[in-house]
UniProtKB/Swiss-Prot annotation:
Pfam families: Ribosomal_L29
Claim: Ribosomal protein is one of the keywords in the record: yes
Designated name of the protein: Large ribosomal subunit protein uL29
Disulfide pattern: none
Amino acid sequence: MKAADIRNLDSNQIHNKIAELKAELFNLRFQHAVGQLENTARLRTVKKTIAQMKTIISERGE
């Protein structure tokens, strides 16, 4: 998800999306530890998206 797309969302939607991504990140880390994760780049992408969303929220002053 691009930063411009994130900026178009309202704060509640961003917070909900962060919660979804954190759950996905938990599952990806578990799969990675077990050795079942095929797309390891997805870990980095999810973490980066969460960071972008948190940055946009802090820019808004919330």
